[in-house]
Structure formats: C-alpha cells, structure tokens
Amino acid sequence: MSAAKVSKKRKAVTKDVEEEAGVFSGDELNVGDIDGALSDDANDLSSDEEDSEVELVDDFSSDEDEDEEEELDSDEIPSDGEAPLKKKSGTSAADLEVPTNDDESSSEEEQPNFRIEKDANGNDRYIYDEINPDDNSDYSDVEENANTIGNIPLSFYDQYPHIGYDINGKKIMRPATGEALDALLDSIEIPKGFTGLTDPSTGKPLELSQDELELLRKVQMNEIPEEGYNPYEPLMEWFSNKQEIMPLSAAPEPKRRFVPSKHEAKRVMKIVKAIREGRILPYKPPSEEKEEDLELINYDLWADEAERPDHPMHVPAPKLPPPGYEESYHPPPEYLPDNKERKAWQEADPEDREREYLPTDFGSLRKVPGYGEFVKEKFERCLDLYLAPRVRRSKLNIDPESLLPKLPSPEELKPFPSVCATVFRGHKGRVRSLAVDPTGVWLATGGDDGTVRVWELLTGRQLYSVKVGEEDPVNVVRWRPSKDAVVLAAAAGDDIYLIVPPILDPELEQASLDLLDAGWGYAASKPAPKASEEGKKTTPPQWVRPSAALADNGVCAVIPLRYVAKSISWHRRGDYFVTVCPGSSTPASMAIAIHTLSKHLTQYPFSRRIKGGGPPQTAHFHPSKPILFVANQRTVRAYDLSRQLLVKIIQPGARWISSFDIHPTSSTASGGDNLIVGSYDRRLLWHDLELSQRPYKTLRYHRKAIRAVKFHPSGRYPLFADASDDGSLQIFHGSVTGDMLSNASIVPLKVLKGHKITGELGVMDLDWHPREAWCVSAGADGTCRLWM
Amino acid sequence: MNGVQDSTSAAASSQSAQRQVRVQLVSKQEDIALPESTGPILVPTGLRRYALSTLVNNLLGNDKPVPFEFLINGAFLRTSIDEYLTANGISAETTLEIEYIRALIPPLHIASFEHDDWVGSVDVLSATSLATSWASAVVSPGQERILSGSYDGLLRVWNMSSQIVATSPSPADGGHGASIKAAKFISPNSIVSAGLDRTVRLWKYNESDDGFSGKITPQIELYGHKSGINSLAVHAPSNRILSASSDHSIGFWSTKKSDAPAAPENLVPSAASRSSKRRKVSSSVSIPQRGPLALLSSHTAPVSAAIFDTNDSTVGYSTSWDHSLRTWDLVTAALVDTRSTSHSLLSLEHLPEHHLLATGTSARHITLIDPRTSATTISAMTLRGHTNAVVSLSRDPHSSYGLISGSHDGTCRIWDIRATKTDNDGVVGESVYSITRRSLEEQGKADAKRVGGEGVKVFSVCWDRSVGIVSAGEDKRIQINRGEGVLSSA
C-alpha cells in the first residue's frame, strides 16, 4: 500500500513537476538566462523571508557547489540513488516519511507483487501493485533540474548532502530537512500562501501565489474558477413572442419541409416490404392463452342449442321491391328528371314528395357521394323501433264501408218535407195538438187557450174557431178518418167535444150532422142508468148536448169523461174512437174508454189495471185488424177486441212511452206489424212485431223528450216523423218491404227546425198530410207549421 | 255620355286585345235593327253585356242609350264572350251570330192599394186586357180598372188613383159568404168570382159616366162545387167559365142564364141547413141560381187551376194536388190526356207560342210541360228560384218568352225561358227579376227572410201591358209594379 501510495505520490509529484517544468522549460527554452534569474529570484525571496540558515541552504544548492560535490560523490550514488529519487519526485510530505518507507520497500522486494488484505467482510482480498510503465515510459521532456539518479532508492544519498544530479551533472542539493528548519519555522510567521509542502522539483517549500489562492477559493466555493466569468449577465431573449421586424433568419423555407422525404419513403417501403414478406409481423398475434384452469368449471349455455321455429309474434321485415332504373347511379336518360321536375321535387315538402330521392346521373360508381341522409335515417329507424316496434295486427281485409248497410242518399228518397211553407199563427199559448183532415185541405188545432181552430192548410187562413174549454186547454184534436162525414173530436178538460165545423158544403154538413144526431135516439131508447148506479164511479158517462153557445159554433155532442183525456184515436171506419186518461188519479178501470159514435155509447173495456208499466198513456186501433194497442209507461199491449184476449206485449225498453204509431200498411203489405214508439227518454224505437218484442232499431237523435211520432198515413210515402221538446222534428224514411226476408230500412232524412222552445217544450204534436209528403207540427211557441 | 262609354269600351278592349272574334249583330225588332250594310264586326272577346250594349248604341247612333241584352244560340250572354266561347267550345275564328234585344228594366213600384183583409185574387181591365179585346170595347188610358177579390168576401174595383170605384154587396145582399179566391173580368161590364163558399158568382158591373163610382150587382149564382174554389178561367167569346175546386172537380159553366142548367138542389143552401140558416133569413135579394154545364171529375185531389187553351176554347187544362196535369175536351167533357209529375201542382199558365204549359208546384219551382201527346218528355224545363209554393202565374204581355210567378214566399219573379243555365238536373231556368213586397220594405225588413213567407204570401199576380205587374197577397194589399218594356219582345 505504501508503495502504491508512493507511486501515486510520485506520479503526482511528477505531474506537478511536469507542470512546473513545462512552465519553466518553455522559458528555459527561450532564454536560459532568465531561468537563472528566476531561480535567483526564488532564492532572493527565500532569502528575504528566511534567515541565515536559508542562506546556507542557498549556498548549498548553488550550482557551483553542486557541481563540485557531484564530481566527488559520483561513485557512491548508484547504490542508494533510487529511494532519494523517489522521494525527490514525490511530495515534500512524502519526503518526511522517507525513512520508514525505505524499510518497507526493502522488504517488499522479496514478496510477490500482490497483497492479501482483509476487506470489510473479512474476506481475503488480493491487491496487486500498480504496474509501472518502466522502460517504456517516455520521459521526453526531462527537466533541467530533474534528478537523474534513475531508479535507485534515495537512501543511497543519505550520507551525502546532495540527493542526486541533474541533467547537467550538477549535484542536486538536499533541501533543508524539517528538523533543521522547524525551529526557524516556529520562530517566524507563516506567510500568506504557505502550504507546508515542498516543491519536489525544486525542493523548496511550495508557496501559492495570490492568484492560485483565489483559484483554490473559487474551487472550494463551487464557483466557476474561470476568470472573468459573470454568472449574472443580462438575459438576451432570442425566441420570444415579440414579432421582430427583421427575422432571425431570412432563409427561404427549405425544400425538405414540403417535399416528401425520399429517405422516409425508402424506410417505409423497406418496412412494408418486410411486412409483406412476413419478416415483420405488424402486430403481435394474439397468443392463444389456453390456460385450462382445472379448478374452474365452465358451463356452455348454448351447447345443445337447436334451431327453433320463429316466435309467433316474429314479424319479418317487409320485403322491399328491388331497385329500379331510377335508383341507379347511372340511370338511362329517360329516367332523369328535367329541370321542371327537379324544381318541383325540391320545392315540395319532404313529406309530399312522391319518392325520396331524385334520380341522378353520377357517371360512375366512384363518383357517387356518401349518402347524406344516412345518420338521419338510422336515427329515425331507431326511433321507430323504440316508439313503434313492428307489430303484427290481425287485420281483417274488409272495407268498413261495405259492412254498413247501403242507405240510399236522402236526395233519392224525395219527396219529403224540408222547408217550412206556412206558419199558422193565432193560438195564444201552446198549441197542444193538431190534425189534418182526411181530404187534406184543413188543419185542426187545439191549444192552451181552450180553442179549437180550423185552418186552410196551404195558405194558413183561419177558417173557424170555437172556444170549448173555458179554463182548460184543448189537449187533443182528431178528425174522424172517413170522408162521408166530417167530425172533429176534441178533448178539453174532462170533456170530449164532437164538432162539425161550419165550413162544409150543405150536403156533407147534413150528412155529418145526421151521423151525430142518430145516436141520440139510440141512447134514449136504452134504459137510463138507475139512480143507484148513477153515483158509482165506474158507470159509463152519458153523452150530452152542448150548450147553446157551443151548439151555434158547431159543437154537436159532449162526452163528460170526468177525467182529463190526453189521447184520442179513431178507428179507421170512423165509428169508434178510443180515449185515454193517463192521469194518475184516474181509476184504472176508467182510464181507457171506447166511444161508439152511432150509439152515443161509452164503454170501459178494461176493468182492471194493466199489470206493470204504470198508467196507460195512449191507445190506437190497428189499421186493419180488430186489435187495440194500449201503451202504458213501459210496454205496449195488443188486445184482440173480438176475442177479448191479450195478444202481444211489446217491450220497447223505454222508461216512459209518450206516443206510438202503427204502420198504416203493415200486416197488409207484409205479414207483420210495424210500430214506432217515442219516449220521453229521447228514444225513437222501431218495432217489427214479427221479429221480436224488443225494438228492431233504436234511434237516439233528439236531445230532449220525444212527444209525438207518426207514420205517413198513406202507403205512398214510407215516411215517419217524430217531434221533440228540443224544438225540432225529424223525418225518417222507413220502408217496409213486402217480403219477409228483408227488414225495414230506416234512413234519417231531415231535421226540421223552426219552432222556438218555450218553457222547456218544443214541438208538441205532429201530423202528416193524408196524401202529400207534407207534415204539420204544433209548437209550444203558439204556432203551427206546415213543412213541405 | 258617349265619351264615358268610349273609355269603358276602350278599357275593355285593352284588357283582352290579344283575342278578337267576328260577330254578326242582328235583331228581330225593326226599330232597333242595324242597317243591312252592317257586316260582321271584329270585337275583343273580353267584352261583356254592357260593353256590347254600348257598342250597339254607338252603331245605332242613339242619343239616349238603350240597354240591350244579347243572345247567342238562344241563351243570354251572362259572361264575357271569351268565357262563353270557352264554355261552349266554340272557336274564336267562327263568326258569332249575336242577337240583341232590349234589356229588361227592373220593374218599379208604382202603387199599393190597401185592403181590410188578405187579397186572394186580382185582375186588370185595361185597353190591352183580354176582357176588353173580347168585348171589342175601348178603355181609354188612365181609365184602367183593377179588380180584387179579398178574403173578407168582397170584390173591389179600383181605379188607377187607388180609389175604390165599386164594392160587391155583403153576403146579406147576395154577396160571397166566405173568402174570395178567384175573381176575373169577363167583359168591361161583367165580373166572375168564386171562393171558399163553393159558389161561382157572376156580377154585373156598372160605372157612372165620370168613372168615380160604380156598382157591382149579383147576376147569377152558380152552384155545383162541394168545396172551395181555387181558381177561375173565363173565355168570353164562348161565354164559358172554368173553375177549379178543392172537391177534386172542375166546373164548366156558362155565363148565360139561358144556357145554364138548373142548380143542383142538394148544394143550394136551404133553410134546413144549419149553417146557411142565418144567412138565408137575412137574405133580401133573390138571385138566379144555376148549375154547371159539366163537372169534370177525374182528379183525385183538390184541383188548383183550370184554364182554357189560348187558341182553342174547347180545350181545357187543369192542374191538381194529385200531381197531374190533365187535358180536357170541353165539348164532350172528356179527359184527353194526363201528365203526371212528381209534385203537387198549384198554378197553371199557357204559353201557346211554345206549346208549353207552365205550372207552379208545391216543390217551389215552375215546371214547363208540353201537353201535346207527341211530346216525349213531360217536363221541358224547370224554373227554379222560389222558396215556397208557386201559386200564381201570368204571361208577359210583351214577350212570348216572359212569365211572372207569384209565390207564397212573398216574391213575384219574372222569368225568361231563354235565361237558362245548365244544372246537373238538366237545363234550369233562372229568374230575371224578383219583386219583393212593398209592405216588407215599408216595415224596414226588406232583407229579413220570412219563414214560410209569413204575412207576405203572394196569392195572385196579373201582368197587363198598360198597367204593369199587379200582385196581391197576404199583406192585405195590391201592389203594382211597372217596368218600361220590362221584358223585350222578340
């Protein structure tokens, strides 16, 4: 170790020496005299700083002295020359330890060139000596003052004052040793730049100059040792956001910036080639990691999956027709739209367009642009799927129109009443009832003012008026149906009045009067009711002659019914009529009365109350058969008068029947009777008695109660009408066919409006002209109207 | 005036200067005919009636412009010529023959004669009326008389100054016992009337010399009908009367006492009769009672009207509510022909020049029926426009094409059977003018529509050449309207 150190030291010394030698050598090469001067200066310095002993040393080291001594001791030097040389070349510190070093180095010579040392772990460690370059080392620049004793220990010169010889053969004097100098050193101040080292090349104590000390300080302070270096120079911003007027470089843009690099292309092609040949795999093939973990059990859900038939709700997408020429990217010219068509297509609303695309000629497929509507269509399709998924509807392929019965249009069913032709004004208060006479010339009306009036039908001229009810309204007026005599029956208050209006020709008037007068004798011939029976309520009333005032006005007979009759209906032959008193106070046995004109006879055919359905409302004779129809609130019953039997019960299903009518030609044209029933609960019901007890058809067209229904009396026009409290009449066409197979067809024809609603009441009664398709209505507003 | 017309025609021509058509203007009337030399004229097709009328006036050199109407192929030009050509598919290169006639001037209201009750019938005695011509009498202008039969049972004779010259006697003195629905002059001195009292009454009418008072005296009572009489027709040269009654029969009567048979006993009011008792008691005069020459009864419903053929008094026509029009041979009282329509017929008028019968129907229109047996179609034309039953018809004295109708809707309408339009029902006539009731206008309700013609129904209308259009109705008045040559004759 010490050897290595020595060698290292030596190297270092050598280096130092070299540096110094360099410095000096350069000078020396140029001016030899200056070298001497320098050394002289050094000597001067040392002499200035040191005392006489130094002078002594100086003396010793003077060139002349050394030369002399070298000559004297030249023989002895080779034996001991190496060590002093080593010491000389080493640092001055090494020089101080020279004696011990010498001992070790001498023992080293017998040892191998390595040592075994213990390292930190206690293991053996071989440490080899450093290899000396020896002979091969080239000391090209041997310094003048360098010791030339060679590779001999310096200890050989221990006996001598010099330590070797320089290149000129002069003795190199041994520098003064520490022991000699210590006393001096201690006695003097340590000057600035004192290092305590000995310059090995000069043997003088190494002193550092001011510059060197400054340099050392900078190194110690981690400063840049270079002189004149300013770490705080002002910053020059070369690249900043400031737009310079003159650019840093005005060079034109180099070509490489915009020309594709051929080099890169070459490189890319190389890679491409390699990829093609398979030398480079563009991506790492996924390594099939088949780590069959035996601990995990995988279940294959679809292992035994088999083809299944489609779900019943599966709806395959509708098949689109194959594309045609128009959809081609290069359609034949005749499919291309001209400018006009193109403009029309563009201007049309997208929804109105006949087709969604415009045939366009692109020339070639590669010129076809991307489909602009793609995203939109996909989006809409998604919306469709979300909002309106495809559903299979079980659709019947039947035109709904064909299911409807074929109703003829009203135009084809003319004539029917459509406009108001005449207004009959004169009644004060409501007109409760009206009737057109069998000849169709006159109209009889009765109203709340207690008068019965007869009008000329066409012109609306009032021909005759009689006030029959003093207080009570005239509830109903009805003409006797046959034409051989003219009799008007009117019900006002508790009485029935039979009137022959004085508007007839003498012959007919006489016939009418005779008809009515004939009964007086018959009634008189009958035994008068006994006094005991007189008081009984069930006794049929006796017909009486009217008062003189009434008789002058054409009233011929009065039937005191004792209860208010609201319905009169004549038998078609004109000899009988039936009256109904629907009042709740009326005894059931007296509600319905049949009056015989020729005998002045009143009979009560029903002794008991009709079961179910409340009090009777109205009654009509069958137009051809001896059957009496009686309606109570909920049912219509047919009684065979000759056999005195209940024939049929008709249940219209209405809550409260207001009126009904029997088809005039029913049962003569066809086998069955047809009935229309109007009810206060707004329903008009058509009954075909052959079909069912229940209504064949229910017509609910009115907003309020239906007051009256009536068939056209002649078989000529298959019309019927109803009158309602909503102030309107409705005209229907209801044809009854002769054969049994087809049912009656009912066509609503016309709503006749005109009557004002007065006190919640609209049209109170209606009647048809016996021949024409004209109809008359009695309104609660005090007018009657003729509709034609 | 002419300058204005020129500018209008210039404006019209500038509008459609691009198309022109060659027209030949002709007229059948001598006084307004263009000179022979006038050849076809090239006119713009944009011209309408007014521009054409101006053109003709200019050609005639009239100082006072006369309005003209123009007929192309027998139909009135109601559009521009261009539209007419387009509508009828006629090339503009053909020469169009356009006939022009004097335009109808809207008839103006002259006077209204107020009555106490509804007026059911009206007739006119004037220099040009039939009764005058039959009697070869002379009625000086200004001395025209108007006869009205009212619903109060009285006949009234009016002069043109709205004064009543004469009134028929009351029922007690041999007058009508009920409303009069028909009244006519037979001659300037005799009147026939009928009504709801089932009698036809002949009256003698005498006038004082000054013409301000007169007297109607009952002449004959004709019994035979069992129900009210709706209309009368007279033919003075043969002394015959036709009556239409609601008892489904037509009475054929003679105006001469000597000709007529005795009255049927059962129809003559007797003391036994209840209703005539009161009347008989107070009756102070005895009037000859006669029966019908014949009762023509084959109608099945009230007969609304019966008329004589204009040319042949032995032929009668009748219409009835039973929808039929019947032709009668009055000599033998035999039914010749029956023409059935689909509606009740309420009035009848003969248009002899066209061999047509015009009948008013309850279905609010007038049907023109060809009564000849050779005619294949029953209805030649329908005139539509009324809104209620048409109950009275009268011919235009000026024109064989003209017609006036009175309806229950409260209007009288003037028709020209050449003014037609093609409907989906075929050729349909349109009314030329509509005369409303003055009474409505006086009430300030001219525009108000009466439901069913309430209060303003027209019952009778008569068109006389010198007096004008006389109509009577439910508003208790006779209304006289006159237009100077209302319809052009042609």
Swiss-Prot record, chain A:
Which compartment or compartments is the protein found in?
Nucleus, Nucleolus; Nucleus, Nucleoplasm
PROSITE patterns linked to this entry = WD_REPEATS_1, WD_REPEATS_2, WD_REPEATS_REGION
* Pro residues biased stretches: 318-335
Q: Where is the composition biased (Acidic residues)?
A: 41-79, 100-111
Its family remark reads: Belongs to the WD repeat BOP1/ERB1 family.
- Quote the subunit structure annotation: Component of the NOP7 complex, composed of erb1, nop7 and ytm1. The complex is held together by erb1, which interacts with nop7 via its N-terminal domain and with ytm1 via a high-affinity interaction between the seven-bladed beta-propeller domains of the 2 proteins. The NOP7 complex associates with the 66S pre-ribosome.
Give the function comment from the record.
Component of the NOP7 complex, which is required for maturation of the 25S and 5.8S ribosomal RNAs and formation of the 60S ribosome.
Please list the GO biological process terms of this entry. Answer: maturation of 5.8S rRNA from tricistronic rRNA transcript (SSU-rRNA, 5.8S rRNA, LSU-rRNA); maturation of LSU-rRNA from tricistronic rRNA transcript (SSU-rRNA, 5.8S rRNA, LSU-rRNA)
Any one GO CC term of the record: PeBoW complex
Basic and acidic residues composition-biased segments: 115-125, 337-354
Alphabetically ordered keywords of this record = Nucleus, Repeat, Ribosome biogenesis, rRNA processing, WD repeat
Q: What is this protein called?
A: Ribosome biogenesis protein erb1
The record's PANTHER family line, in alphabetical order, gives: RIBOSOME BIOGENESIS PROTEIN BOP1 (PTHR17605:SF0), RIBOSOME BIOGENESIS PROTEIN BOP1 BLOCK OF PROLIFERATION 1 PROTEIN (PTHR17605)
Give any GO molecular function from the UniProt entry: ribonucleoprotein complex binding
Swiss-Prot/TrEMBL WD repeat ranges: 426-465, 469-509, 611-649, 652-697, 701-742, 758-788
User: What ranges does the record give for the region Disordered, renumbered to this chain?
Assistant: 1-125, 308-354
Extent of Basic residues compositional bias: 1-12
The gene name reads erb1
Predominant localisation class: nucleus
Swiss-Prot record, chain B:
PROSITE patterns in the record: WD_REPEATS_1, WD_REPEATS_2, WD_REPEATS_REGION
Q: List the disulfide bonds.
A: none
GO BP, one annotated term: chromosome organization
Annotated region Ubiquitin-like (UBL) domain: the residues are: 21-102
Molecular function terms from GO = ribonucleoprotein complex binding
- Provide the residue span(s) of the region labelled Disordered: 257-285
Q: Please state where this protein is localized.
A: Nucleus, Nucleolus; Nucleus, Nucleoplasm
Keywords (alphabetical) are: Nucleus, Repeat, Ribosome biogenesis, rRNA processing, WD repeat
UniProt keyword rRNA processing present: yes
InterPro entries hit by this protein? G-protein_beta_WD-40_rep, NLE, WD40/YVTN_repeat-like_dom_sf, WD40_repeat_CS, WD40_repeat_dom_sf, WD40_rpt, WDR12/Ytm1
A Pfam entry, by short name:
NLE
Q: Where is it found, in Gene Ontology cellular component terms?
A: nucleoplasm; PeBoW complex; preribosome, large subunit precursor
Q: Does the keyword Protease apply?
A: no
Residue ranges of the WD repeats are 129-168, 175-213, 224-263, 298-338, 340-379, 385-425, 453-490
According to the lineage, what is the superkingdom?
Answer: Eukaryota
Write out the similarity annotation.
Answer: Belongs to the WD repeat WDR12/YTM1 family.
What does it do?
Component of the NOP7 complex, which is required for maturation of the 25S and 5.8S ribosomal RNAs and formation of the 60S ribosome.
Q: How does the record describe its quaternary structure?
A: Component of the NOP7 complex, composed of erb1, nop7 and ytm1. The complex is held together by erb1, which interacts with nop7 via its N-terminal domain and with ytm1 via a high-affinity interaction between the seven-bladed beta-propeller domains of the 2 proteins. The NOP7 complex associates with the 66S pre-ribosome. Interacts (via UBL domain) with mdn1 (via VWFA/MIDAS domain).
**Full protein name:** Ribosome biogenesis protein ytm1
The organism is: Aspergillus niger (strain ATCC MYA-4892 / CBS 513.88 / FGSC A1513)
